[in-house]
């Protein structure tokens, strides 16, 4: 149960942060956001704000999306002769077009629609008491569709494709950008929780309670200078010296550790402890505890995580295998394991997954943010927009590829995790 809760929390935070980036910068760029959705499939919860954006929580934890005006099949069609009820504002502009038999306004004006333009001229024409009349439509008017769903009209100036290149570019990049920011923030938080960043350049050590070094008298922040005569000036030196000193070591044998404590040099016999096939002496790298050190430590962890992910991506390109990929099932399995290991493991997983999601979404596949960014760049270079039909076909092909890949990855994860 703890694993499921952890998975839902991590998944929810990653998706909300990613989609909020798209949502925020779409709004800033003047694009009408139709829907902000968390998850896929049937709606569990929905709410419409005053700006006409529908917020939904959906059943399947397979991602999320921000649906913008002008994307896909976004136009509302009103057939000639359709009965409608018009609600006018104080200026005489239509503020609501009701095509349903629900949400009726007793003050509304009945009309049989004969023509309309809700994108450019913003007008609606029809028969009112057997007389043809045309009314201006307010820029933020809404339509109540036949099923009772109320949505805002989308004039050309609030549609995605009519926003500036810069606006569309930052809107598409904002999702991955938010994931990178989240990853960095969580890694910094992790370093603060741990008390600092390990200092691998130093030979000062932290001593593990009841470990071999503690039993021999070493204390936190003591400085190990030699092990069995091997000089130690850094953490790497220390691990190499332990490895060399414990080769062919007998069960009851000890090694000589020379260390400096309170400016005094001491040499003690330490009996290493064997874990699997390696020996340890119960010490860890000392921590850099300054505020600046912690901030830089978080950035260092984020960069290291990104570098690891990029190397894995490179390996995937040179030698593709489904076993190198993971979907929601693998994410659940990792969340479950992290939950068993405590808060720090959960935060570390969240940070890595967030950076991973950011990098993955920048891959220039049409269905991903990277594909949209690539089309924005091509449009900027050509100085003319890509045809909507062409962009739609390219995106559809990308979606098909991603759906097939997701099914294959999920099936592979199920077989690997549960069987």
Curated annotation (Swiss-Prot):
Its main location: membrane. Its EC number is 3.4.24.-. Its cofactor is Zn(2+). Signal peptide: none annotated. GO terms for molecular function: metal ion binding; metalloendopeptidase activity. SUPFAM superfamilies: PDZ domain-like. Belongs to the peptidase M50B family. PANTHER family: MEMBRANE METALLOPROTEASE ARASP2, CHLOROPLASTIC-RELATED, REGULATOR OF SIGMA-E PROTEASE RSEP. NCBIfam families: RIP metalloprotease RseP (TIGR00054). This is Putative zinc metalloprotease M6_Spy1682. It comes from Streptococcus pyogenes serotype M6 (strain ATCC BAA-946 / MGAS10394). The lineage of its organism: Bacteria, Bacillati, Bacillota, Bacilli, Lactobacillales.
């Amino acid at each position: 149960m703890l694993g499921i809760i952890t998975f839902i929390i991590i998944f929810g935070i990653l998706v909300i942060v990613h989609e909020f980036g798209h949502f925020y910068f779409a709004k800033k760029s003047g694009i009408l956001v139709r829907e902000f959705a968390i998850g896929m499939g049937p709606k569990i919860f929905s709410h419409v704000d005053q700006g006409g954006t529908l917020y939904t929580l959906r059943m399947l934890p397979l991602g999320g999306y921000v649906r913008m005006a002008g994307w896909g099949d976004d136009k509302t069609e009103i057939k000639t002769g359709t009965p409608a009820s018009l609600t006018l504002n104080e200026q005489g502009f239509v503020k609501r077009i009701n095509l349903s038999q629900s949400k009726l306004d007793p003050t509304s004006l009945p009309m049989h629609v004969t023509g309309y333009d809700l994108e450019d001229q913003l007008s609606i024409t029809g028969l009112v008491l057997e007389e043809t009349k045309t009314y201006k439509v307010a820029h933020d008017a809404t339509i109540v569709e036949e099923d009772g769903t109320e949505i805002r009209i989308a004039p050309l100036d609030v549609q995605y494709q009519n926003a500036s290149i810069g606006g569309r570019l930052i809107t598409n990049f904002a999702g991955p950008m938010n994931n990178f920011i989240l990853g960095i923030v969580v890694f910094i938080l992790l370093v603060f929780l741990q008390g600092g960043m390990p200092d691998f350049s130093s030979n000062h050590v932290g001593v593990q309670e009841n470990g071999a070094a503690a039993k021999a008298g070493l204390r936190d922040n003591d400085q190990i200078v030699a092990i069995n005569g091997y000089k130690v000036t850094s953490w790497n030196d220390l691990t190499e010296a332990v490895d060399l000193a414990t080769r062919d070591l007998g069960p009851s044998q000890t090694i000589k550790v020379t260390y400096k404590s309170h400016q005094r040099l001491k040499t003690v016999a330490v009996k290493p402890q064997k874990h699997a096939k390696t020996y340890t002496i119960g010490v860890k790298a000392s921590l850099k505890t300054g505020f600046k050190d912690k901030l830089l430590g978080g950035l260092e962890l984020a960069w290291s995580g990104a570098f690891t992910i990029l190397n894995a991506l490179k390996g995937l390109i040179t030698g593709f295998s489904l076993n190198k990929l993971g979907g929601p099932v693998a994410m659940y399995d990792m969340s479950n394991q992290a939950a068993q290991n405590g808060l720090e493991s959960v935060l570390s997983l969240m940070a890595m997954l967030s950076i991973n999601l950011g990098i993955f979404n920048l891959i220039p596949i049409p269905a991903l943010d990277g594909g949209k960014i690539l089309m924005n760049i091509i449009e900027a270079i050509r100085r003319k927009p890509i045809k909507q039909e062409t962009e739609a076909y390219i995106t559809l092909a990308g979606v098909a590829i991603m759906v097939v890949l997701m099914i294959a990855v999920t099936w592979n994860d199920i077989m690997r995790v549960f069987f």
